[in-house]
Amino acid sequence: TGFILLYFSTKNLNFLSKILILLGTSVLVISFIVVGHSFSSGIYSQLLVIVHVICISYWVGSFLPLRHMCTINNCKNLHEVAHNFGVYAVIYISLLVITGLIFSYILLGGVSPLITSYYGNVLLIKISLVSIILAIGAINKFKIVPNIKVNQIDGKNKLKSSIEIEIILTFFVLLLTSILTTSLTTPLGV
């Protein structure tokens, strides 16, 4: 339902479209808390998941537009857009990591189940992949994006390649997330 509302809302960007985008986004976010472990873990966990999903949406949702900007010849504002993205990303990626760690701790009931349970092992792989994506993002922010100002062609090609790697790794993170959410029981039996 959420995707359908989002699809129709992009036809015209008037007031109704903005309402449909908000409604569609809300339906998508709520769907994450009514299916999976957060539903059984209480309202605090559900709020963590809502913040987590919103932050993921901002982060991952930027990949394709930024990648597209890298394919445009003589894209004059790529440096500015990528730089501003990096500034805001610090905020929502921090929230993403904090909410993810707290929610993981709630689901695991401690740190040791990361090593001693199958659920924890899969979660540890997911955390490792996210750490790699964060490292790539840091390289983008501090090395590649500043290079765009000096050498736009080289900088935008490197940023495009870097974003493509992030997209591939994100696919695997989302795959692991779906396995953790729907197929595995937490060490606490949730």
Regions found by a protein language model. Give the residues of each.
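Polytopic transmembrane helical bundles with strong interfacial aromatic enrichment
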Residues: 1-190
